[in-house]
Every structure is written in structure tokens, then in C-alpha cells.
């Protein structure tokens, strides 16, 4: 049974409080009641602290502009509050800074004494009431109010003890032990990621980067090479490669760009040079020139940012070798320069990924929830993909690439589409993408520019589900096979 319960903080707060009080009711001894009250209090204190610490990682919060950003959203926004903040930016900066300090320093309530603790709880409840009025988060008032009787109880108990600093010391020791275990798990996960699965191999490119690749190389007449999106690894192509594997006349290769998975950057170049999109293009060309067999017809497939890479690579591969490219919901080189919404979206992605990347690079990937798309992949790839998602390498590599996109594409005069006169082009777009006016326009423009003989809009598909949904991915694989077979017949 599916339910939306538990999808927000108020549900989670209520669950923690109700579960603990149920235990206290079932075992009504003084020690059990005391322990459950401490549990509720510490859950409440850490919920405020964690919220503040995560906000500190976000650039809009540090710049003091996050509140107006929230107020302009359709979900939690409030037109009057947004207009007020626009007229009084200094107030927004002060309010944002105050909120960050208040939440981040909340655990210090145990050092301040019961009177200060009561004032802090009163301030917290006032904050929740304000959120309820402005943002419509009425349930948060009652969900988080249930924490505060326990917090007040424990601050009084702590001040009454002779060893007043015993709890902070014990809590710090326990926290250090937990962090130690998490860091050991992170080191083990990093080793698994760097080793890569045993069914893949490594190849050193002309740039000195080492690419980890896999696939089927049996000397078929057509070779399909697949390029990943941003913040994505070759496991995303699992359903598509499963379909291609059943085609006798098609070989295929998937790989991870340098920095992702078990693929490694040239250490010397990484220290001295700034990443360019063309660096990945050169690696792809080097990979193809090494693994492509004489006489094979080549088809390149690129998803999202991978589409931009294969589009550039197509200009550098001999036309007698490259016979087709498949652009799957591909990046358009002008999409950020020609659309303010797309440019703003790119910045939001950069900010969001920076927050997550910082947490993961600090070794706390174990605390991240297993994403739904991992569960949609073929079973053999799920553990690999989950380890990569929780490891900092993927987030560091993605941040390096998204910064390059901002420098090279989000500019006044971005590069333009270039003709591929001897190469067939198939364009696949998700229906959700086509519903967006700007993104849909870009997909149509690419199809018209290349005169794409095969332009497909896949119904009930999103940008990600084109690869991760097995029912959708098999249709994408069909388009790839159609192009591969067409090029074979045209030989």
C-alpha cells in the first residue's frame, strides 16, 4: 500500500514522538519514561540543528536570499511576504542569518540552562506558527510542538545534575563513535567504486585519463557507444544494454567519463588545468578509435549532457565510420543562453548538487536515502549504482562538468548547432520535456535543424525514465536498433 504519510518533517516528528510515548505507556517505569523523554528531546534538538547545518551549505542561504526564493514558489510561497522581502532586502538578510544561527546552534540549549531553554522553545514555536500562516505548514506547528515538553524537561534535568556537563560529553562521545563507523563505511564504499565491477575493463586515453568501460564486443557489423548524462554513470543504460545484448548484429560499449565510477582523471592535468567539455569529447574519440574495429559502422548515443558530447564528437570522427547519432532528451547548446528559466534552472541545480556533494564528500553518503531510480535499474546494477550515488567522486565529477556548462554554454554567444551532412540523426524526447515550452522548443529546433528522419516523443516519460523505466527504455532501445539496422542496410 502506498501512502504520502511520512513524506514531510511533520509526519516524521509525529512518528518519533508517538512511538516513544507508546513505549513509555507500555512500560511505565520512571527510568523508561525518563529515557523516552530524552530520546524525544534529542530527536527534536537534532532536527533543528541538522536543518541549520544543511542550510549553511546552500549558497542562497549564505547570501541571505533564500527566503524570498521560497516565498516566490507556487508550493510554499506567499505573494505578500515575497513583496515585503523584495522591498526590504536588509530585513531578509538579517532574518536569514538569524534563522541559520538559531537552528545551527540549537544543541547549545543544554549549556544555557532551563530559563534560556524556555525562551528558545517559545521562539521555535513562534517560528512554526509564522510558517503555518505564511507557508501553509500548519501541521508542522503540532508536529514540532510535541518535541518541546521533552526538551524543557531535559534542560531542567540537565541543570539539576551535579555533573552538568556529563550529557554533552557522553553525547559527543557517542556522536564521535557513530561518525567513525560512517567514515569507515565511506572508505569501504570508495574502494568498491574505484575497483569497479569485475566484468568491466580499463582503457587509457590519449589525454592520460583512464576510462572504465563494459559492453559486448564480438565483432558485429555495428558498434553502438553510449554517453552518460550529468551526475550519471553507465549503469543508467542497464535496460537499454539488456535489449541490445539480444541483437546479434550489434556490439555496444558503455563507459564512465573520467572522475566517475572507476574511471580516473590524469592526476597531473587535474592539478593544473580547468575542465572543458571538449576534454570529454577527446576521451570519447580516443575510446572509439581504440575499440572500434575496421569495417564496423559506428552509432553514438547520448542522454542529456551526453548528447552535447556526442554531437561534438561526431565532427571529429570520419564520416565513413560514423553513420548515426541518437540524441536522447539532449542538451541544446543554446538552451541556457536563450531561456532565462533554463539558465535559472541550471543555477538551482548547481546549488542543490553543491549541497549534496559537500555532505557526501565529507563521508556521510551512508545517511542518504536510496533513490527510487536505483530500484528501477536491472538488479545486477543496483548495488553498483547505489555505491556510486553515495560516493563523493560522482558528485565532484558532476560539479566539475556543470561548472564547465555554465562557463561554456550559459553565455551571451554560446556555440551553435553544426551540420552533420553524412550522419543520420534520431532524436528522442520525453513527453514531460515537450510539455515545457522552452525545453520542447529546443527539441523541435534540433529535429528541424538536423532534418531528423526519426524524431520520437515518448508518451508518459520523464527525462530520467527514458533510461530507468524498463517499459520506456525498451522503446528507446528500439529506436537505437532501428537506426543501427538502417545504417547496416544502407552499406
Identify the meaning behind each predicted range.
Residues 257-301, 317:
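Active-site loop/oxyanion-hole signature of alpha/beta-hydrolase fold enzymes
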Residues 448-491:
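Catalytic active-site module of serine/aspartate enzymes centered on a nucleophile-bearing elbow/loop
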Residues 44-45, 49-102:
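Membrane-interfacial catalytic/cofactor-binding modules of polytopic membrane enzymes
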Residues 295-339:
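Conserved hydrolase catalytic core segment
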Residues 216-264:
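Conserved HGGG/HGGXW glycine-rich cap/lid loop of the alpha/beta-hydrolase fold
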Amino acid at each position: 500500500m502506498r501512502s504520502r504519510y511520512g513524506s514531510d518533517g511533520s509526519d516524521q516528528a509525529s512518528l518519533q514522538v508517538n512511538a516513544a510515548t507508546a513505549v513509555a505507556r507500555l512500560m511505565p517505569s520512571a527510568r523508561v519514561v525518563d529515557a523516552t523523554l530524552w530520546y524525544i528531546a534529542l530527536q527534536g534538538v537534532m532536527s533543528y540543528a541538522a536543518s541549520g547545518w544543511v542550510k549553511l551549505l546552500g549558497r542562497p542561504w549564505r547570501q541571505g536570499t533564500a527566503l524570498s526564493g521560497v516565498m516566490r514558489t507556487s508550493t510554499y510561497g506567499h505573494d505578500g511576504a515575497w513583496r515585503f522581502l523584495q522591498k526590504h532586502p536588509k530585513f531578509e538578510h538579517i532574518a536569514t542569518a538569524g534563522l541559520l544561527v538559531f537552528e545551527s546552534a540549537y544543541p547549545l540549549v543544554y549549556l544555557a540552562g532551563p530559563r534560556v531553554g524556555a525562551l528558545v522553545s517559545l521562539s521555535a514555536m513562534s517560528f512554526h506558527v509564522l510558517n503555518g500562516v505564511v507557508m501553509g505548514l500548519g501541521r508542522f506547528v503540532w508536529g514540532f510542538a510535541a518535541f518541546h515538553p521533552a526538551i524543557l524537561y531535559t534542560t531542567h534535568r540537565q541543570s539539576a545534575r551535579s555533573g552538568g556537563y556529563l550529557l554533552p560529553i557522553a553525547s559527543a562521545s557517542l556522536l564521535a563513535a557513530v561518525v567513525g563507523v560512517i567514515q569507515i563505511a565511506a572508505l569501504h564504499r570508495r574502494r568498491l567504486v574505484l575497483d569497479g565491477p569485475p566484468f568491466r575493463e580499463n582503457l587509457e586515453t590519449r589525454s592520460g585519463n583512464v576510462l572504465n568501460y563494459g559492453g559486448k564486443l564480438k565483432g558485429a557489423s555495428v558498434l553502438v557507444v553510449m554517453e552518460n548524462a550529468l551526475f550519471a554513470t553507465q549503469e543508467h543504460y542497464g535496460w537499454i544494454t539488456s535489449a541490445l545484448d539480444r541483437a546479434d548484429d550489434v556490439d555496444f560499449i558503455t563507459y564512465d567519463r573520467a572522475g566517475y565510477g572507476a574511471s580516473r582523471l590524469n592526476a597531473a592535468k587535474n592539478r593544473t588545468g580547468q575542465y572543458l567539455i571538449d576534454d570529454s569529447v577527446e576521451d570519447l574519440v580516443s575510446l572509439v578509435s581504440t575499440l572500434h574495429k575496421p569495417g564496423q559502422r559506428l552509432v553514438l548515443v547520448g542522454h542529456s549532457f551526453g548528447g552535447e558530447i556526442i554531437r561534438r564528437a561526431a565532427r571529429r570522427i570520419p564520416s565513413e565510420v560514423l553513420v548515426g547519432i541518437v540524441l536522447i532528451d539532449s542538451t541544446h547548446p543554446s538552451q541556457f543562453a536563450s531561456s532565462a528559466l533554463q539558465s535559472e534552472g541550471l543555477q538551482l541545480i548547481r546549488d542543490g548538487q553543491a549541497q549534496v556533494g559537500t555532505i557526501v564528500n565529507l563521508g556521510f553518503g551512508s545517511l542518504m536515502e536510496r533513490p527510487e531510480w536505483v530500484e528501477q535499474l536491472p538488479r545486477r546494477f543496483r548495488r553498483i549504482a547505489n555505491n556510486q550515488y553515495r560516493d563523493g567522486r560522482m558528485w565532484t565529477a558532476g560539479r566539475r562538468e556543470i561548472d564547465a556548462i555554465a562557463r561554456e554554454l550559459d553565455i551571451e554567444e554560446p556555440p551553435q548547432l553544426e551540420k552533420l551532412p553524412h550522419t543520420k540523426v534520431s532524436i528522442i524526447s520525453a513527453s514531460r520535456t515537450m510539455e515545457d515550452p522552452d525545453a520542447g522548443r529546443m527539441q523541435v529546433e534540433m529535429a528541424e535543424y538536423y532534418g531528423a528522419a526519426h524524431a520520437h516523443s515518448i508518451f508518459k516519460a520523464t527525462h530520467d525514465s527514458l533510461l530507468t523505466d524498463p517499459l520506456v527504455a525498451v522503446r528507446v532501445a528500439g529506436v537505437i536498433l532501428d537506426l543501427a539496422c538502417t545504417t547496416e542496410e544502407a552499406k
